Amino acid sequence: MSRARSSDPDPAADLPRLPDWLRGLPGETLEDAALSAGAALALLHQVQSRAQTPLALWRARLALQAAAQTARHAGRPEREAAIRDALCLMRPGDAPGPAGEIGLAWQRAVERPLSDETLARALPHLAAGQGAALPGAPIQQASAAIEAALAEAPRDHLTALVLGDAALARALGWSHLLPLLGLGLTRRDLGAGGVDLRLTCHRAVLKAAGPALQLAADLARQAARLQSVVPKLRAKQSTRAVQLVLARDAIAPAMLTGLMSDRAARRFCDRLVELGAARELTGRETFRLYGL
């Protein structure tokens, strides 16, 4: 993708980064890990209040990464590209497959404001009361939610991780779930319990925060580039189509046919690539997907 001219202001200039000193803290004790994780969460909180961050897209991209991580927990071979295909190319009535189900759950968990209804839509098998608020500090609540879910279903890492991130977001007062524990915790990590799991969750938040902050900065720059080319787009409904691109991890041209013809949708997507405002994400000649 083409970069903005060096004379242009950097849209991500005032977005926070994870400082090197914070990355380097040992986090060997719960107190040290809590300090580091708290600082990282404060930076993530700042990102969510900055207008230049395409938040829906940011959450969607993180959700895709979390889905790939969760698929690894289950021993599945699918990575981000395969899960993206399952989500974007699925037709009404199609079964997304096991990895696609994981991707769909994470996508549904992040795309709407956090609520009991959002969690039930993401995890239809949730029992009444699962996901309820718990006592303690935010990461303590998240750790307890994970431990409780695994006590009910030890192999269901997806439910445990979604509920853990939901508990964390609620405790922090965030409007939407952000898949930090889904990104930062490994299958081995989930074998711990009690204080050990709490320590691991603090470390996982710090581990996930750095890449999440960098992704926010990258997407802010790419979103600014996309917005800058809108006057060059000739298709009717271009502004609405651009808003859809800014809200999704990826789109197929067919997703735009409610706004324009199939041919116009393909031209629109190819024009974005030509202008350096989007990428074709698959490398294929057919069934192409586009995004930032």
Task: Please give the residue ranges for each predicted region.
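A short, conserved structural fragment
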Residues: 273-283
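Short acidic (Asp/Glu) and glycine-rich catalytic loops that position anionic groups and cofactors
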Residues: 42-47, 216-224, 247-249
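Active-site beta-strand/loop microenvironment that shapes enzyme catalytic pockets
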Residues: 142-173
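Short amphipathic alpha-helical interface segments
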Residues: 229-257
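Short, cationic-aromatic polyanion-contact patches
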Residues: 234, 283-292
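Short amphipathic alpha-helical interaction segments
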Residues: 260-273
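Long, low-complexity, charged/polar intrinsically disordered regions in eukaryotic proteins
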Residues: 162-230
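N-terminal structured helix/loop subdomain that forms the ligand-binding/catalytic interface
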Residues: 1-145, 176
